[in-house]
């Protein structure tokens, strides 16, 4: 994609959302058309089905907020929203197979009530953030780490404002926001007295569309401690602005849990806890940004960080059309959607049997 095209893409994204909203039909108008025979304009039928998934809240309308609720009709729109293509943060999060409260594709398929249709949903930030550790400068009292941070769409650089957070044991460094033309180098300094491993979080906001915010993180060794894979010590679950941290190992002690957005960061309040888990209340932040949540703790003498994003994206769920492509017609439809006022890219694949 040429750079000029990418510029136009982001500059016009909000306008496209408004156009899509104006074109949106109600569920009463959409659903009868979706039951037409396959032979009657199959591409248009598939398009209407893809819209239906994003424009309707499903039944019960608040099924995303309870881990005991399973939708009887499927849709992921936010209940009561005046905007079209405005998705519910908890319904989206429960589509992620890594979420402890995830619903299965079999449950989604059954709730859609269209046995001749398979579907797949992908939701991701509007552009990518890549983090690479490029240099380490070890001193007597501290170590400086240099990172290369790239922001791009299909390999084309995306100018963005960046906010970086560095986390280690009882240590938080918040860098002043900076602007990148697609690639920039950032230094973070961690004292030698602080135990590792460490973590850097980068949130990137497009200069063309302030509601388009992407993110990434990078765990790295500090001192002699190397990072373990995410999920080694805690299983983090998100639902209804509550974080549940379930212990994956014995002798786990939680130190601090923090939430980070582009404009804000906050230490979360623990609401309940026992010897197997702890729960935290997640604030409703004012800015258009995903929330990155980091829990720190120790396992005996080992310090660790665990992290999760709210909404829990990027995600892909549904039918595996890579293995079904010789058996099904498949159409893909791309939409700009909002989740808690931030803009994301959503691709819906719809497939049916060949004629």
What are these regions (language model features)?
Residues 1-26:
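N-terminal single-pass transmembrane signal-anchor helix
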Residues 23-355:
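Long, compositionally biased, intrinsically disordered regions
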């Amino acid at each position: 994609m040429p750079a000029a095209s990418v510029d136009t893409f982001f500059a016009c994204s909000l306008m496209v959302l408004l156009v899509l909203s104006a074109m949106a039909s109600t569920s009463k108008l959409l659903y009868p058309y979706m039951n037409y025979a396959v032979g009657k304009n199959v591409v248009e039928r598939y398009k209407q089905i893809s819209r239906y998934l994003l424009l309707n809240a499903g039944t019960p309308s608040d099924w995303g907020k309870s881990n005991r609720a399973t939708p009887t009709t499927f849709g992921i729109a936010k209940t009561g929203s005046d905007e079209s293509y405005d998705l519910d943060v908890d319904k989206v999060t429960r589509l992620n197979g890594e979420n402890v409260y995830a619903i299965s594709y079999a449950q989604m398929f059954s709730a859609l009530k269209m046995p001749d249709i398979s579907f797949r949903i992908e939701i991701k930030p509007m552009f990518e953030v890549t983090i690479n550790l490029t240099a380490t400068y070890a001193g007597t009292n501290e170590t400086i780490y240099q990172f290369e941070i790239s922001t791009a769409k299909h390999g084309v650089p995306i100018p963005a404002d960046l906010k970086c957070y560095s986390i280690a044991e009882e240590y938080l460094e918040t860098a002043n926001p900076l602007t990148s033309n697609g690639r920039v180098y950032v230094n973070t300094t961690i004292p030698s007295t602080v135990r590792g491993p460490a973590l850097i979080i980068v949130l990137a906001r497009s200069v063309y569309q302030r509601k388009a915010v992407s993110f990434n993180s990078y765990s790295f060794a500090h001192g002699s401690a190397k990072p373990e894979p995410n999920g080694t010590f805690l299983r983090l679950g998100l639902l209804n602005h509550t974080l549940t941290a379930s212990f994956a190992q014995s002798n786990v002690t939680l130190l601090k849990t923090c939430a980070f957005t582009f404009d804000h960061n906050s230490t979360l309040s623990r609401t309940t806890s026992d010897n197997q888990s702890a729960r935290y209340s997640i604030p409703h932040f004012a800015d258009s940004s995903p929330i990155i949540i980091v829990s720190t703790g120790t396992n005996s003498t080992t310090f660790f960080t665990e992290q999760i994003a709210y909404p829990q994206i990027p995600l892909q769920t549904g039918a595996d059309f890579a293995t079904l492509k010789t058996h099904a017609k498949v159409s893909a439809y791309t939409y700009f959607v909002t989740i808690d006022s931030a803009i994301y890219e959503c691709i819906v694949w719809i497939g049916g049997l060949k004629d």
